Amino acid sequence: MSETARTTIDQSEVDRFSAMAAEWWDPTGKFRPLHKFNPVRLTYIRDRVSEHFGRDAKSRQPLEGLRVLDIGCGGGLLSEPMARMGADVVGADASEKNIGIARTHAAGSGVSVDYRAVTAEALAEAGESFDVVLNMEVVEHVADVEFFMTTCAHMVRPGGLMFVATINRTLKAAALAIFAAENVLRWLPRGTHQYDKLVRPDELERPLEASGMEIADRTGVFFNPLANQWNLSRDMDVNYMIVAKRPI
């Protein structure tokens, strides 16, 4: 298959999330786990970006002046907080329904986000570039992980960062993130994740490094049921995040 024919889109995944689009901003609905997950990933992104670009993470708008791409933005759960922190945000998603929900919510919240129903490859082909690219809980839903990572890496400006968050392909992840989360605890609709589409860290890092990126940080993330919150961890066997930087 030629590279021009490659696509990152898995239409069945787009359809699955389009069908749930109306629930994006319901903290007790089908996206409840993402609402729970948002604080730890927002803090991690803010702190890493602030450290990298020499910003004060505790200031009101530490991302002011930075252009940020939230790829696979869904209803905007990350895009809106990024914009509130001062970033110039492009929220991109392959689902027109998701983008419609995101635009409506942003308008009602008074937050400015440039939402687009567009693919990563279309943005890259248009020559778009960003200081920060966010791939959060997306790679396990795309059709071609290597192509997706390469495409997104090309949009990171020199001196810029990419964040990736996903679920590891391990038996532990299958037990906790799929069986328990979807079938026992019912945190997610059944079928949200498929084991063979989960991605190991090395499968992300190889195409990033081949695209000239350098791995800057890695962290696991785990859910503490006693505190009812997500925390960073050294254990990357289930949920994890990777930060890559493009040298100047």
Curated annotation (Swiss-Prot):
Q: Where does S-adenosyl-L-methionine bind?
A: R41, G72, D93, M136
Any single Pfam family the record assigns to this protein: Methyltransf_23
Q: Which GO terms describe its molecular function?
A: 2-polyprenyl-6-hydroxyphenol methylase activity; 3-demethylubiquinol 3-O-methyltransferase activity; polyprenyldihydroxybenzoate methyltransferase activity
Kindly state a single biological-process term from the GO annotations of this entry.
methylation
Keywords attached to this Swiss-Prot or TrEMBL record, sorted alphabetically, are:
Methyltransferase, S-adenosyl-L-methionine, Transferase, Ubiquinone biosynthesis
Name the protein family.
Belongs to the methyltransferase superfamily. UbiG/COQ3 family.
SUPFAM superfamilies, per the entry: S-adenosyl-L-methionine-dependent methyltransferases
According to the entry, what is the taxonomic lineage of the organism? Bacteria, Pseudomonadati, Pseudomonadota, Alphaproteobacteria, Hyphomicrobiales
In which pathway is this protein known to take part? Cofactor biosynthesis; ubiquinone biosynthesis
Q: What is its EC number?
A: 2.1.1.222, 2.1.1.64
The record ties this protein, via Gene3D superfamilies, to: Vaccinia Virus protein VP39
Q: Which HAMAP family match?
A: UbiG (MF_00472)
Primary enzyme class: transferase
Role summary: O-methyltransferase that catalyzes the 2 O-methylation steps in the ubiquinone biosynthetic pathway.
Coiled coil residues, start to end: none
Designated name of the protein = Ubiquinone biosynthesis O-methyltransferase
Q: Which cysteines are joined by disulfide bonds?
A: none
Q: Which reaction does it catalyse?
A: a 3-demethylubiquinol + S-adenosyl-L-methionine = a ubiquinol + S-adenosyl-L-homocysteine + H(+); a 3-(all-trans-polyprenyl)benzene-1,2-diol + S-adenosyl-L-methionine = a 2-methoxy-6-(all-trans-polyprenyl)phenol + S-adenosyl-L-homocysteine + H(+)
Q: Matching InterPro entries, A to Z?
A: SAM-dependent_MTases_sf, UbiG_MeTrfase
Q: Which gene encodes it?
A: ubiG
